[in-house]
Structures are given as structure tokens and as C-alpha cells.
């Protein structure tokens, strides 16, 4: 017997094509996995929404701001659209990209102990970015930590320009 998923969740996530930087097959694959993981397990409730989900989320960038366009699964009317400054996330995302580059380089040449140390740092930065994102969203969208982690992954995947 299958369990009915909770209503306050995401049922679809898209990334704005115009916001996505050029990337190879590996990055495309990671984006697809991040979206799949997010849709499999998430808690997502727009603050103050009198209705209930499930919701669709379109993530993009506009005027150097993160745009979260939230709609109901059924219907095209927006529930809410949030525009968030990227400034608070910039440093952690930049550091995250740098450590990811080190991690991918280490996979080819470093010892397992070195790879593990870099990976621990990578996960720590990912957690830091997720906590910061969750804090930035708290008055707009209620998300649990795992959902914030998956959203942070997708925000990083945008490889915003500039």
C-alpha cells in the first residue's frame, strides 16, 4: 500500500535556462540528480499561503537576485514570487566552488585520506550554505534542512553569471 505524499512539498522544479551557465554533461547530470533528490523528499511551505500544495518551483536569476517563482501544482497563477539578494550567499558559494575544484582534482591524484579531508571540508561548506539559505528563507518559505541542502545545490548549479 503506497503512502500519500504530504501536500506541502515540491512536485516539480525547473531552472531558468537563461540563468544557467554553460556546462558539460557532468554538471547537467548533477543538476538532474539534485532535482530528482529534491523531489523525492522535501518539505516546502510558502509562509502565509492560505492554500496547500503541492507546489512547483522555478529558480532563476534576475538583476543579480535569486528568483523563486512558486505556483500550485494545478494552476498557473503564482502563489508568490520571491527575489532574494545573492550577496549573503556569494562568499560561501565561491568557497564551495573552489573546494569542489580541489576535490575533483584530488580524485585523480590524491590519496584516499586527502580526498576524504577535502570532501569533509566540501560537506561543511555545503552545510554552511544550506543553513544560510534556510535562514534567508525563514520568513518566506518554510523548509527543513535537507530541503535547504538540495536547494543550495541547485542554486550553485545555476553558476550565476558575474
From Swiss-Prot:
InterPro entries linked to this entry: UCP032146
A Pfam family assignment: UPF0262
Domain of life: Bacteria
Signal peptide annotation: none
Transmembrane annotation, as ranges: none
Recorded family membership: Belongs to the UPF0262 family.
UniProt name for this protein: UPF0262 protein AZC_3148
Lineage, uppermost ranks: Bacteria, Pseudomonadati, Pseudomonadota, Alphaproteobacteria, Hyphomicrobiales
Amino acid at each position: 500500500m503506497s503512502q500519500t505524499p504530504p501536500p506541502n512539498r515540491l512536485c516539480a522544479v525547473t531552472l531558468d535556462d537563461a540563468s544557467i551557465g554553460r556546462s558539460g554533461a557532468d554538471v547537467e547530470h548533477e543538476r538532474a540528480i539534485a532535482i530528482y533528490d529534491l523531489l523525492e523528499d522535501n518539505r516546502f511551505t510558502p509562509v502565509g499561503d492560505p492554500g496547500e500544495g503541492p507546489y512547483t518551483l522555478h529558480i532563476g536569476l534576475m538583476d543579480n537576485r535569486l528568483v523563486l517563482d512558486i505556483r500550485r501544482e494545478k494552476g498557473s497563477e503564482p502563489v508568490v514570487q520571491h527575489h532574494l539578494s545573492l550577496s549573503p550567499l556569494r562568499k560561501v558559494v565561491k568557497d564551495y566552488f573552489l573546494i569542489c575544484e580541489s576535490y575533483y582534482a584530488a580524485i585523480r591524484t590524491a590519496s584516499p585520506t586527502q580526498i576524504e579531508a577535502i570532501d569533509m571540508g566540501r560537506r561543511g561548506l555545503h552545510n554552511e550554505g544550506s543553513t544560510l539559505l534556510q535562514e534567508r528563507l525563514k520568513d518566506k518559505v518554510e523548509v527543513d534542512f535537507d530541503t535547504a541542502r538540495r536547494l543550495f545545490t541547485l542554486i550553485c548549479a545555476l553558476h550565476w553569471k558575474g
